[in-house]
């Protein structure tokens, strides 16, 4: 009978935690929009920093190209054209390609990490809410679920149940 009371307390506590998480999930639509806008702002700032952050290097290369052309002028080898020199354009193009390639690789890694975290969170919430999930993603999910189940099974003093369990104990 005592185990039934403990089990019912745990079930009630689990339902309360699940309801709180679900309510946070529903009520955070505005927060999600704010976080999305903040992420976009950070992305734009990061892009502008990556593209223009080392622009002094490009400017220095352009000055070097112009310097060598200007050295030829006093020697009577005057070279004038209305078209811009191809060398600085190639330098800038190569620099931009390089920076954009590095940025796209970093961005792809970040997106993959975020997708993995979202997947883990979804599985964790499904397990918490008792919803069946057809496929298990990987062994880390099983180990995290085991940690979470172990945390549920611990005895808590004062009869508080799950409310004392921090989410860090059931890491995602």
From Swiss-Prot:
Keywords: Cell membrane, Coiled coil, Membrane, Signal-anchor, Transmembrane, Transmembrane helix
Keyword Transmembrane helix: yes
GO cellular component assignments: plasma membrane
Cytoplasmic topological segments: 1-36
Membrane topology: Single-pass type II membrane protein
TM annotation in the entry: 37-53
Superkingdom of the organism of origin: Eukaryota
Localization of this protein: Cell membrane
Chain ranges on the Extracellular side, renumbered to this chain: 54-172
Coiled-coil intervals: 96-128
PANTHER family: SMALL INTEGRAL MEMBRANE PROTEIN 23 (PTHR37865:SF1)
Name of the protein in question: Small integral membrane protein 23
Gene source species: Homo sapiens
Gene name linked to the record: SMIM23
């Amino acid at each position: 009978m005592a185990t039934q009371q403990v089990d019912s307390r745990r079930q009630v506590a689990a339902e309360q935690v699940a309801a709180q998480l679900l309510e946070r999930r529903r009520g955070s639509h505005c927060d999600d929009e704010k976080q999305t806008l903040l992420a976009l702002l950070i992305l734009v700032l990061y892009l502008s920093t990556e593209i223009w952050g080392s622009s002094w290097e490009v400017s220095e290369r352009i000055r070097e190209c112009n310097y060598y052309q200007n050295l030829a002028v006093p020697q009577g080898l005057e070279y004038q054209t209305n078209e811009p020199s191809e060398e600085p354009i190639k330098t800038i193009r190569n620099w931009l390609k390089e920076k954009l390639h590095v940025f796209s690789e970093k961005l792809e890694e970040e997106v993959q990490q975020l997708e993995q975290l979202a997947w883990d969170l979804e599985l964790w919430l499904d397990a918490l809410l008792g919803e069946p999930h057809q496929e298990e993603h990987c062994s880390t999910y099983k180990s995290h679920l085991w940690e979470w189940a172990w945390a549920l099974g611990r005895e808590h003093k004062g009869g508080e149940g799950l409310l004392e369990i921090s989410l860090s104990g059931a890491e995602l």
